[in-house]
Amino acid sequence: MWLFRSGEDGLPPIVLYHYTETRARYNAVDFLDGFSDGYLETDGYQGYNNLPGIRRCSCWAHTRRYFIDVVPKGKQYDYSNPAVQGVQFCSKLFEYERRSQNKKHTFEQRKAYRLEKEKPILDEFWSWLDEQKPRKGSRFET
């Protein structure tokens, strides 16, 4: 089962469920045929990679989960651990998203709020990420 949902643009969302017998990449390619020059926010499924005319965006909840999965279990948080730092970046973004939702921002207000509050966090995150050396075989290895 595939789920496609429109973005949060101030209009009522469009939600489409599409059943296929497999989750093969060609199903996404066929369904999204004609959708171009747009953004597609996805989970980590590799079948979405390199879809023609589409810029893929990662889901922050999934990104955060990848960091959480490698945080050492059963210990107090070690804030020098890169996985813990990655979780903290994501948590800051989620906190600002919650605040924006609680303030019931319009689409334009949310965009301005994100540029003011979240963009500096994202800029810092990307710089931090460039300095990291992911372990061989990890989801973050390029």
Where does each model-flagged region fall?
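Catalytic center-proximal scaffold of phosphoryl-transfer enzymes
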Residues: 1-142
